[in-house]
């Protein structure tokens, strides 16, 4: 068989055409949400450790959209179902925060805190219990969880003080915070300082003389406290994780942003509250029985109330921390 030679320019053009077609097909595959793969569908359900269908569908759609836009290259994405219980009793935490990595066919369900809200005594009560969240919202200083679409952003690590271990060693406590940027009703996430971090805090703070410490102030004093783990408790509106989970999640998104979808949004809450659940809307049955009717507090109505309460009940002047009694 006699082969005719093909000009080099034609070969180059054909090669580029193949690449362009391949890239276009790839982009389309991301842009159009594909069916949930069978291995992932096996994790769908309403039991502890499973992810409810509507939560997965919305989280996956958000992720694929951001990948198609070129905003996300991370192979994993996050979701949270804040209608589920955070505490199952007997020291067992509810798993309602999800880490999905489709490329490696990995699915994890872990615990996470929900926003505790506040009780402005004599004015309005939008606080939440430890187990289930009844109140949601996006108002400044409300300490409520707001559902919707988020992107993880920069990591900020800050020194909080020292604490003493069981081995009588003083350890510097530095906590890393992952800032979230939200969309729609969650668009003020940065303004509200909403993000993710370990569920740890220093309590019973005092000042100790440690002049040789790199963290000492101009008087040679450092803050000292008791390290408290509140993984089974409530947050100030952020997603809070156990220390071990926090280390893993922060390493996954540091300098490599991804998406987080938090359920429910205000439309879901309205549907449940009205008793006319729209298609795709759901609520964890155990928590719904406990809380009765959920409520969303929009910022336009709640922020003026909080501002007035602040004005009527000014915070006392900040006092310096006491000197530690123990050496």
Q: Language model features by range: what are they?
A:
Residues 1-7:
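N-terminal secretory signal peptides that target proteins for export/translocation
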Residues 30-236, 244-327:
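Cell wall/extracellular polymer interaction/catalysis modules
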Residues 241:
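A conserved hydrophobic position in a structured secondary element of the catalytic/binding core
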Residues 10-24:
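Bacterial N-terminal signal peptides
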Residues 21-33:
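Bacterial Sec-dependent signal peptides at the C-terminal "C-region" and cleavage site
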């Amino acid at each position: 068989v006699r082969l005719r030679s093909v000009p080099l320019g034609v070969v180059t053009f054909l090669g580029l055409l193949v690449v362009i077609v391949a890239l276009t097909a790839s982009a389309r595959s991301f842009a159009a949400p594909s069916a949930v793969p069978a291995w992932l569908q096996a994790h769908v359900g309403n039991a502890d450790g499973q992810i409810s269908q509507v939560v997965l569908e919305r989280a996956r759609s958000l992720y694929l959209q951001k990948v198609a836009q070129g905003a996300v290259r991370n192979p994993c994405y996050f979701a949270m179902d804040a209608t589920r219980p955070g505490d199952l009793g007997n020291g067992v935490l509810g798993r309602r925060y999800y880490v999905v990595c489709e490329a490696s066919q990995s699915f994890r369900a872990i615990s996470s805190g929900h926003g505790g809200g506040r009780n402005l005594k004599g004015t309005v009560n939008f606080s939440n219990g430890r187990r289930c969240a009844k109140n949601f919202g996006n108002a400044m200083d409300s300490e409520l969880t707001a559902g919707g679409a988020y992107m993880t952003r920069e990591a900020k690590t800050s020194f909080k003080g020292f604490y003493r271990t069981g081995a009588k060693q003083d350890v510097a406590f530095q906590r890393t915070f992952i800032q979230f940027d939200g969309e729609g009703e969650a668009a003020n996430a940065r303004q509200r300082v909403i993000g993710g971090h370990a569920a740890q805090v220093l309590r019973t703070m005092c000042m100790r003389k440690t002049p040789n410490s790199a963290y000492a102030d101009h008087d040679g004093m450092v803050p000292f406290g008791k390290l408290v783990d509140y993984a089974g408790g409530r947050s100030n509106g952020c997603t809070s994780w156990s220390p071990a989970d926090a280390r893993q999640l922060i390493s996954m998104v540091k300098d490599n942003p991804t998406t987080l979808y938090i359920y429910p949004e205000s439309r879901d809450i309205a549907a449940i509250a009205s008793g006319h659940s729209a298609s795709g809307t759901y609520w964890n049955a155990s928590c719904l029985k406990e809380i009765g009717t959920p409520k969303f507090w929009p910022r336009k109505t709640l922020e003026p109330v909080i501002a007035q309460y602040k004005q009527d009940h000014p915070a006392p002047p900040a006092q310096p921390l006491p000197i530690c009694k123990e050496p």
